[in-house]
Amino acid sequence: VQLVNWGFNAWAKYDNYARDSRIGAFVESHTGLSRSEPQRHDGTGRVILEGGGIETDGRGTMLVTEEWLLSDVQVRNPGFTRADYE
């Protein structure tokens, strides 16, 4: 088991989420599990995703909708295309 510490930007709506970025390190330090932080290909930080937007089965399958991931209204990863996510 490994922690996946996605980036978070408060649904691209709010500015007060700075403390949220520390939760991955906190969970890692209290569980002893290793943590990975998927990085953007342009080197600007972690890939932004949030719970509820993705579903996984723990065996390599992930479900997500294009409407959520590629939203022009709530941009999670500016400049990312469908191919970047795939």
Where in the sequence are the language-model features?
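The feature marks the mature, well-folded catalytic cores of soluble enzymes
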Residues: V1-E86
